[in-house]
From Swiss-Prot:
SS bonds (residue pairs): none
Residue spans of biased composition, Basic and acidic residues class: 31-40
Lineage: Eukaryota, Viridiplantae, Streptophyta, Embryophyta, Tracheophyta
Encoding gene (name): GRIK2
Stretch list, region Disordered: 21-64
Residue positions, PTM Phosphothreonine: T153
Stated induction or repression of this protein's expression: By geminivirus (CaLCuV or BCTV) infection (at the protein level).
GO molecular function: ATP binding; kinase activity; protein kinase activity; protein serine kinase activity; protein serine/threonine kinase activity
Annotated positions binding ATP: I113, G114, S115, G116, S117, Y118, G119, K120, V121, K136
Family the entry assigns: Belongs to the protein kinase superfamily. Ser/Thr protein kinase family.
Tissues/organs with expression: Expressed in shoot apical meristem, leaf primordium and emerging petiole (at protein level).
Protein name from the UniProt record: Serine/threonine-protein kinase GRIK2
GO biological process, alphabetically ordered: protein phosphorylation; response to virus
E.C. number(s) listed in UniProt: 2.7.11.1
Amino acid sequence: MFRDSFLFARTIGCFGCFGSSGSRNQQSPKPYDDDTHSCDSDVTSTARGEEEEDEEEVEQKSRSKRSEEILKYRLDNGLICRHIPVRETNELIRGEDENGDKTINEYVRVCKIGSGSYGKVVLYRSTLDGQYYAIKAFHKSHLLRLRVAPSETAMSDVLREVMIMKILEHPNIVNLIEVIDDPETDHFYMVLEYVDGKWVYDGSGPPGALGEKTARKYLRDIVTGLMYLHAHDVIHGDIKPDNLLVTSSGTVKIGDFSVSQVFKDDDDQLRRSPGTPVFTAPECCLVSGITYSGRAADTWAVGVTLYCMILGQYPFLADTLQDTYDKIVNNPLIIPDGLNPLLRDLIEGLLCKDPSQRMTLKNVSEHPWVIGEDGHVPEYFCWCKRNAASKIEEGEANGISETSDPN
């Protein structure tokens, strides 16, 4: 049932229009195929007038510009949470090795592992460290021609994704290793860590979804990674199993930041959700112009993902996109009888239609079902916290107190 609804979801635009190929070659290595982009599916799009379109264009431009300005400031001032900065390479050498395999600088092509409307994802092996990497390959001219919003091209999405990934480093987030952008060529590459396991979706079809044990393990990783993003003022915007990759050791990593936004001063208000329709929060399905909390919308998407992992189907899905949105907004949540009461409570809390009453990720991390036998979800002591702590310790060692008066 789940796989049937999954395939249907692709046909109505829930996955296919986001740059994914819509199919997977099961014989190929499992890719980190996050070369996706979402089309804005507004349930009132047919009723919008020119004035509303202009207002949305201004808002879209303002939101994206705000994110880019914040990111540029953080990068320019070294406000990043990475122990090792992303390498930036401005020279591209394309060729072949002695076996006739194509090469990009130090990387030797192995096979194509994904494709999308923006470009393709190819598995490469580094001749320097012998490791495998997933490289997203783009043509800059194509990105500049491809319009994704009234005032934005696909190049804006890709550059914003790069900037976001440059400031982040976490074990539950796909890591950006290098960016190759030679101004003398039309090629642009993102070198990412290769996740050699599977998608969260794999194995989630009949006859029994994932089961509580696996779903709990995956959820803990998802919550840990997303809490880190929110703590660093990043809204993912498209949390769904397709963007959650599982390593061979079972660790979940969040990928695809192509529609993500950043905020500051605790102001996470957004308009026009860019995410996948069946994972869209009710407040994002309402008449355009209404703002919503990006963090609360991300949390709803976590709830839909958990529902999928546990029950093997979507909580709200209809025959058309319009009807799907109507169900998300108006239909009651249906949870089968006999489900673990603690799990039922968690799903109901995550999929609360009122965002002000919806569970926060902190609530989720402390929920009895999530704690289970594994204990509380550990707080990740990230690089910027470690760096700040070391500076405080260094200051104390030098006799400088945070509260000391320099005068």
